[in-house]
């Protein structure tokens, strides 16, 4: 009888052990999913990782864009393909085909100004895996958290690369095109339909300015895409409609406070890039005002 009790007890223990192991393995993919690249907290300002999309300074070299981002109070920078590297090397550009030496020079300049590169785009991602891999290798080399694209047709390749490289992808929106009804990226409902059943590291690069140019309210769009915001090109525009232009935050119609509140409510941990597409030759004062607005708003909220 004692032997029978011991056998029964052993079977119970083994079942419990096996259940525990099964539970651990079931949770493993979720743990891996949550392991996507995190921007170090030291680069946070006012509760957000705020900086510039280098395209803001596309009249200048990357080195100058880095300097101007730091001068404006930014802590992070988002790269775009094709920008000249420096005044000393005007024939050298930064993109995913650049040489290792060029990439190292860019990394050194970014580190010199105590910034961190977080994103790259807007750039096309090919369906061909070998070609797509060049982009993800570049992102890994530069230590980026994400790539920004509009290549919806390459979604299967993108998802495979995201899983392999643990690098996020944000689908960007440009304004609604009256002469091209096939363009649907402006519509957050369409974008949600593209990403909702895909890896959680695939989502939206929320360009709030282009939503305003499409006569959409950014806060409403963010709510539609709740939980799938990878990054944001944050803008405040002077009016709703396709001809609108950038204004310093708080002086336009985009409801920047509402946008920040919604991003905070969603637990957003991506980068906010100022992509200021106005006053191109002398935008640093305006950009600094935008960054100061975000920093001050977050500090007042104790985020």
Locate the predicted segments by residue.
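Bacterial N-terminal signal peptides that target proteins for export
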Residues: 7-21
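Active-site acidic/histidine proton-transfer and metal-coordination neighborhood
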Residues: 29, 36-37, 103-104, 109-206, ...
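Conserved beta-strand positions in the central sheet of alpha/beta enzyme cores
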Residues: 78, 119, 148, 170, ...
């Amino acid at each position: 009888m004692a032997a029978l009790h011991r056998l029964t007890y052993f079977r119970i223990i083994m079942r419990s052990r096996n259940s525990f192991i099964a539970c651990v393995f079931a949770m493993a993919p979720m743990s891996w999913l949550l392991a996507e690249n995190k921007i170090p907290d030291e680069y946070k300002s006012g509760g957000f990782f705020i900086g510039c999309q280098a395209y803001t300074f596309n009249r200048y070299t990357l080195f100058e864009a880095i300097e101007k981002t730091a001068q404006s109070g930014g802590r992070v920078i988002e790269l775009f393909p094709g920008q000249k590297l420096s005044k000393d090397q005007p024939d050298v550009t930064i993109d995913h085909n650049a040489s290792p030496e060029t990439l190292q020079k860019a990394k050194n300049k970014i580190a010199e100004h105590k910034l961190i590169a977080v994103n790259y785009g807007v750039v096309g991602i090919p369906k061909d895996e070998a070609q797509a891999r060049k982009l993800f290798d570049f992102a890994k080399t530069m230590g980026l958290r994400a790539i920004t694209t509009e290549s919806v047709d390459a979604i299967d390749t993108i998802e495979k690369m995201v899983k392999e490289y643990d690098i996020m992808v944000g689908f960007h929106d440009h304004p609604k095109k009256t002469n091209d009804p096939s363009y649907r990226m402006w519509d957050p409902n369409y974008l949600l339909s593209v990403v909702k059943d895909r890896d959680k590291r695939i989502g939206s690069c929320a360009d709030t300015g282009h939503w305003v140019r499409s006569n959409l309210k950014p806060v409403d769009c963010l709510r539609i895409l709740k939980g799938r915001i990878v990054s944001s090109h944050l803008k405040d525009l002077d009016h709703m409609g396709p001809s609108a232009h950038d204004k310093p935050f708080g002086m336009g119609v985009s409801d920047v406070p509402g946008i920040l509140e919604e991003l905070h409510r969603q637990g957003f941990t991506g980068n906010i890039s100022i992509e200021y597409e106005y006053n191109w030759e002398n935008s640093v004062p305006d950009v600094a005002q935008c960054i100061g607005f975000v920093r001050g708003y977050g500090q007042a909220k104790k985020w």
